[in-house]
């Protein structure tokens, strides 16, 4: 570009009336480029985006980078600084990671934080718009103190976005990059929370005026052993043993959820199950995968749209159906998929279900050769189209996403924070890996979900740790087989450990924050401030006993003050001036007042 012109103005948007600095670039045979910078009054961040305008012809691009820093200034204190890897979705047991700046190249999805753990000062870069683009932040390391370069761009498509072809191109007289936030914060954790809040301003979380769901899901143990009689027995077990003994949410409600396998029930059995739940003071839940074909039989006719075969609805890449997790991806914009949504939602509504777990959502966000709707140009556009339809048909139910991208987030009340988790300390550690660096996601959804808590075939310490991982994450969902033929151990452990009143009171749906950001796998210390009460959690993911001193100053407390502390699993009073001991594969959950 040969010419540039800067102007200032004010605009009104979700952030209020804010200043905008526009820089317009022109050049021979080039589309006009206009970059906007929005400094947000009272905040430690600015927003930026740019448009390409074709004067006489359409413009087309599948990569637009509003932030491109080729020589990164030293923004942080010198020291062993870190950069976060945030995954695009939660499939295939993907893990978050805090990296020392010793990598050649690191790509994070939608957002990253780069920070000094000791001072906690850090900067956050990420997309706050998720209508058209999958966004990535690509970083190159200079040395352990600083990055060499950073580029934040719309147009990410690779193995970790589950794509097998390049990102779709936006095409039109005018095309726009994602809107990106760049902020410098005294505490990187606050920075990620403010990033989430900015997202929620633009796309508010799906409304919910009831308490966080607490209950049961059949996939924990029963899986495809789920039957109608067993489902009734589970509902009765909760009524008789748990929900009258502190295992319920603050609405005194328990959710009993049928997962995959419910389709072996007749409609009459489904209705009778829902009615049993209602009689037991419970809400019935169910399960569906809207964007998948598990049969993978291209010539089969769609049951709910018999004028179409499955080959008509696949999302093709390079002429082939796209397979992920054993299922083919289907086109969220195809009328046959809408017909399936309509018929399935009508069935759920006739039966009386009020909660639905939606799974394998990333299939609907894949890049493709084309979509049925010709206006769709990118995978995320297709996903938004499909999710809006999902809300049209299921919007009066509670929607909990399971395997899914983090963004867009406005179509469901909650989302599972990681992949599947069961009963062992490794399941707790894996769940807490996502909470370590993704706790803030409960600001773009109503709640995070730590998956089903299974208690059988694990030590009692592992039980305490796994339950703690749920109550400090969000949704509180048990998973053992509580039918009459189910494990005696699972029932005894549930009656013992799912009924601790002090522990269960913590489960208000607000995720705990990490205290540090340097875990090689997961952080093991977390906290939440509730008015004048501070909760401190320390996990021991290892086999051997460990001792820790509660880091009072790091969690914002004055060691000189008189503090009362109680460990909630044992009920024991804790002397905060002394080290506390955590047995192997266990947890301490401490309330400090």
Positions of PLM-derived features:
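Carbohydrate-recognition beta-sandwich/jelly-roll modules
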Residues: 1-250, 280
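Carbohydrate-binding surface patches
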Residues: 46, 470-473, 478, 516-558, ...
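Conserved, mostly hydrophobic/aromatic
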Residues: 50, 172, 216, 399, ...
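Solvent-exposed beta-hairpin/edge-strand motifs
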Residues: 69-82, 553-569
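Substrate-binding cleft of carbohydrate-active enzyme catalytic domains
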Residues: 211-368, 379-382, 389-393, 399
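Glycan-recognition surfaces
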Residues: 301-339, 381, 385-488
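Aromatic- and carboxylate-lined catalytic core of secreted/periplasmic carbohydrate-active enzymes
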Residues: 467-517
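C-terminal beta-strand-rich structural cap/linker in extracellular carbohydrate-active enzymes
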Residues: 574-593
């Amino acid at each position: 570009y040969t010419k540039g012109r800067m102007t200032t103005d004010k605009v009104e948007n979700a952030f209020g009336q804010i200043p905008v600095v526009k820089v317009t670039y022109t050049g021979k045979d080039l589309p006009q480029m206009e970059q906007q910078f929005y400094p947000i009054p009272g905040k430690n961040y600015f927003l930026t985006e740019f448009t390409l305008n074709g004067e006489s012809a359409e413009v087309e691009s599948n990569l637009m980078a509003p932030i491109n820093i080729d020589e990164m200034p030293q923004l942080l204190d010198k020291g062993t600084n870190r950069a976060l890897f945030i995954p695009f979705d939660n499939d295939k047991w993907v893990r978050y990671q805090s990296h020392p700046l010793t990598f050649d190249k690191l790509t994070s999805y939608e957002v990253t934080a780069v920070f000094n753990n000791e001072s906690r000062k850090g900067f956050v870069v990420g997309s706050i718009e998720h209508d058209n683009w999958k966004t990535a932040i690509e970083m190159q390391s200079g040395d352990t103190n600083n990055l060499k370069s950073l580029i934040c761009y719309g147009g990410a498509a690779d193995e970790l976005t589950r794509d097998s072809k390049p990102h779709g191109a936006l095409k039109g007289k005018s095309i726009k990059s994602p809107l990106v936030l760049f902020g410098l914060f005294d505490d990187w954790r606050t920075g990620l929370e403010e990033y989430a809040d900015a997202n929620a301003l633009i796309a508010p979380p799906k409304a919910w005026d009831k308490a966080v769901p607490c209950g049961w899901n059949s996939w924990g143990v029963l899986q495809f052993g789920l039957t109608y009689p067993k489902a009734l027995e589970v509902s009765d077990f909760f009524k008789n043993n748990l929900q009258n003994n502190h295992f319920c949410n603050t609405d005194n409600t328990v959710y009993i959820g049928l997962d995959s396998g419910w389709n072996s029930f007749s409609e009459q059995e489904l209705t009778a199950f829902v009615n049993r739940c209602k009689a037991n003071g419970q809400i019935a839940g169910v399960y569906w995968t809207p964007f998948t074909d598990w049969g993978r039989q291209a010539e089969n006719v769609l049951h709910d749209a018999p004028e179409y075969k499955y080959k008509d609805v696949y999302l093709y890449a390079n002429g082939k159906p796209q397979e992920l997790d054993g299922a083919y991806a289907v086109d969220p914009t195809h009328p046959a998929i809408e017909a399936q949504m309509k018929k399935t939602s009508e069935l759920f509504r006739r039966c009386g279900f009020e909660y639905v777990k939606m799974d394998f959502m990333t299939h609907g966000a894949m890049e493709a050769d084309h979509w049925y709707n010709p206006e769709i140009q990118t995978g995320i556009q297709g996903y938004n189209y499909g999710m809006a339809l999902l809300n049209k048909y299921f919007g009066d139910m509670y929607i909990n996403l399971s395997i899914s991208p983090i963004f867009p987030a406005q179509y469901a009340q909650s989302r599972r924070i990681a992949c599947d988790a069961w009963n062992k300390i490794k399941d707790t550690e894996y769940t807490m890996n996502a909470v370590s660096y993704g706790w803030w996601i409960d600001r773009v959804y109503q709640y995070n979900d730590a998956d089903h808590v299974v208690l059988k075939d694990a030590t009692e310490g592992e039980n305490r740790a796994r339950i703690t991982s749920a109550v400090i994450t969000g949704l509180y969902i048990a998973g053992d087989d509580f039918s009459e033929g189910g494990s005696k151990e699972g029932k005894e452990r549930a009656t013992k450990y799912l009924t601790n009143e002090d522990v269960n009171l913590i489960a208000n749906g607000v995720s705990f924050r990490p205290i540090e950001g340097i875990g090689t796998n997961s952080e093991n210390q977390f906290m939440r401030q509730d008015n004048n009460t501070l909760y401190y959690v320390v996990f021991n993911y290892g086999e051997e006993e460990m001792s820790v001193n509660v880091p009072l100053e790091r969690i914002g407390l004055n060691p000189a003050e008189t503090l009362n502390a109680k460990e909630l699993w044992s009920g024991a009073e804790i002397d905060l001036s002394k080290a506390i001991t955590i047995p192997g594969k266990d947890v301490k959950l401490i309330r400090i007042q």
